[in-house]
């Protein structure tokens, strides 16, 4: 099964479970959790079911396209369901069956791995899912997002697409993975991997990046003062990515690092609180729609 078929299979599976299928969000981010489809929609009482592929940029993991297991940009298949259903583990195992992985024939383990994202003020109870000794999925019950308690709790399932494909296709080098007939990851992404690594570690302008961080931070605050959550959050994401570029370049000291993470976290908390307050003013409309559908 190639990666394109894997994605289509997961989309069909989770669509059948009532998930909205959305496209990836168009601002740089380090993980699918950072998409507003997860970060914002996990807040408040309104029900939410979504599945989407998210390209995730990790500048420090760039290896010029030379490492068989490390990528500047990898892909995650993200599922968020709120409130978390009682049979979520069963639904997940069914998704593996749809991918041709029979849980009865493989060693599938849920290894406790509680999750935290300090820069976004997020935390949750979680497990890594191991398939025959290799991590393929992260399972998390959100307890806190943007510093706010999650009521009700959302469940997040994050499939590592390249990791899972390596197992399904039995390939040791990520660049040999077949995306679709006639196209490998090498064909599609190796040039970008090389160039982004050169930029990250060699040609990026550190002074400019520090200026951009300050500009993005200022604009995020300015938009929040106007009550504009989504534009503000876009600039929080830009702050986070710019910080990651600076961090990968070694431009931020250990003591400075803590301060920069706190600055991003403070922005994320403001956005989370503003979003919650704005939805509350609207009377949490999706909650009313859910109640009406059951009448």
UniProtKB/Swiss-Prot annotation:
One of its GO terms (molecular function) is transferase activity. Its EC number is 6.1.1.14. CDD domains: GlyRS_alpha_core. It catalyses: tRNA(Gly) + glycine + ATP = glycyl-tRNA(Gly) + AMP + diphosphate. GO terms for biological process: glycyl-tRNA aminoacylation. Pfam families: tRNA-synt_2e (PF02091). Keywords: Aminoacyl-tRNA synthetase, ATP-binding, Cytoplasm, Ligase, Nucleotide-binding, Protein biosynthesis. One of its GO terms (cellular component) is cytosol. Its main location: cytoplasm. InterPro entries: aa-tRNA-synth_II/BPL/LPL (IPR045864), Gly-tRNA-synth_heterodimer (IPR006194), Gly-tRNA_ligase_asu (IPR002310). It is found in: Cytoplasm. PANTHER family: GLYCINE--TRNA LIGASE, CHLOROPLASTIC_MITOCHONDRIAL 2 (PTHR30075:SF2), GLYCYL-TRNA SYNTHETASE (PTHR30075). Belongs to the class-II aminoacyl-tRNA synthetase family. Tetramer of two alpha and two beta subunits. This is Glycine--tRNA ligase alpha subunit. It comes from Bacillus licheniformis (strain ATCC 14580 / DSM 13 / JCM 2505 / CCUG 7422 / NBRC 12200 / NCIMB 9375 / NCTC 10341 / NRRL NRS-1264 / Gibson 46).
